C-alpha cells in the first residue's frame, strides 16, 4: 500500500489501532498528523515515526471542542501543505443504561459529532483539490446493536449512516468515504469496558474471564490485534481502494457473518 507523498490525519492515534495506523501510514511513505487528547502519547508516536525517517506532527487536544476538531485540519495543511486522508478513529464506550442522558451526550459528542466537524473541515480541503479519502471507525455494534451499550450502538450506527451519505454526496468531487466496523480489539479500552461495574457479568477479580466471554461470539475465538484493524484502514485510505466508497466493512473475525 504505497502512501508515498500522501498527507494523512489520524485521530485517537496515541494508542491501539490508531497508533498502529499512524505507524503503518508513515512506514508506507505518508506524512502523518497524530491527534489525541493524550498529547504526550501523540508526541511519543511522532518521535517514533521521526526516528524511522518519517514525517509527523503531534496535535493534542479534546475533540469535544468544536474549534479543536476543525483546527486539526488547518494545522495539518499548514504543516504539510495539503490533506489527502483522514481516519476518524476516535471512539469511547457509552453507558449500559438508556436513561443516562449525560452519558448519551458524551457518547454522541465523541463518537459522532466530533467526527462530523473534522470531516466537514477536511471536505473543504479535499473537494477543492478534487481528491481525498475519509475513513470512519464505526463498530459491529453499529451494525447489529449491542445490549451492553445502546448509546454506543446508536452513535456508531450514526457514523455508518454518515459515511454512506457522504460517500454518495462527494463521489462526484473525487472524495471517497468509508467506514470500518471492528469487533473486539485487544487494547486497554476493551479491558476498561468489560470490567466496568455497570456491565453484565462484572467481576473485578478476573477481568480476563470477561475478555474471554466478550470474544466467544467471534468464530475466530479471539480479539483483533490493533495492527489487524489498522492494515484494513490503511488499505481503504489508499489508492488501492480507488473504486471503494460507501462501505461499512466488518473487521470482526466473523462476528456478524
Please describe what each predicted stretch is.
Residues 95-108, 214:
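Substrate-binding pocket helix/loop in short-chain dehydrogenase/reductase
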Residues 3-33:
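Canonical Rossmann dinucleotide-binding motif of NAD(H)/NADP(H)-dependent dehydrogenases/reductases
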Residues 2, 80, 116, 123, ...:
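C-terminal substrate-recognition "lid" of short-chain dehydrogenase/reductases
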Residues 89-94:
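Conserved NAD(P)H cofactor-binding loop of Rossmann-fold oxidoreductase domains
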Residues 171, 176, 244-246:
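Short, small/polar-rich loop/turn modules that mediate ligand/substrate recognition or access, typified
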